[in-house]
């Protein structure tokens, strides 16, 4: 079985959604990137949750139930909101909370906006992250600790997205 170490992605590098999903094996089950509607993908082949975050959301691109407040708390800590139906007692919520104990991984990718002057904006892999704490349900507000500090420009963009 492949592991996270076998995934051909580099921390702090930029990738399209299609490249990310192919690299983590999400598309190997006959799924196509266009069928992924939400910003989370559970990849059982590598025991990894992939979180795709857009920092600056607009009413034209996102519904009221997907206007999640995702932002950096510090260069090492990231505040992320789960899907609007996820509770801390659900299997998905429990997977987030107990990922280290259960031997699963979380990969956090961010981009500033959905599009840029060239089309779809790429995501930057902030890297593996560990659960710190959470508050609430539907959505869960989770704090993740990055294994490596995020680049300064991403930290500043993330802070600006909530200002």
Identify what each model region corresponds to.
Residues 1-9:
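C-terminal accessory/connector segments of nucleic-acid motor ATPases
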Residues 11-122:
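Acidic, glycine-rich low-complexity segments with interspersed aromatic residues
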Residues 115-163:
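Compact mixed alphabeta submodule
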């Amino acid at each position: 079985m492949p592991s996270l170490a076998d995934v051909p992605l580099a921390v702090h590098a930029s990738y399209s959604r299609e490249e990310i999903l192919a690299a983590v094996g999400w598309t190997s089950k006959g799924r196509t990137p266009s069928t992924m509607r939400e910003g989370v993908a559970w990849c059982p082949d590598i025991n990894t949750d992939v979180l795709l975050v857009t920092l600056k959301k607009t009413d034209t691109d996102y519904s009221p139930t997907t206007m999640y407040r995702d932002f950096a708390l510090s260069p090492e800590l990231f505040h992320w909101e789960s899907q609007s139906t996820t509770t801390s007692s659900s299997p998905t919520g429990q997977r987030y909370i107990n990922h280290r104990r259960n031997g699963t991984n979380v990969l956090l990718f961010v981009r500033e906006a959905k599009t840029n002057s060239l089309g779809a904006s790429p995501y930057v892999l902030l890297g593996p992250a560990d659960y710190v704490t959470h508050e609430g349900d539907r959505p869960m507000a989770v704090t993740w600790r990055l294994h490596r500090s995020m680049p300064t420009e991403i930290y500043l963009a993330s802070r600006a997205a909530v200002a």
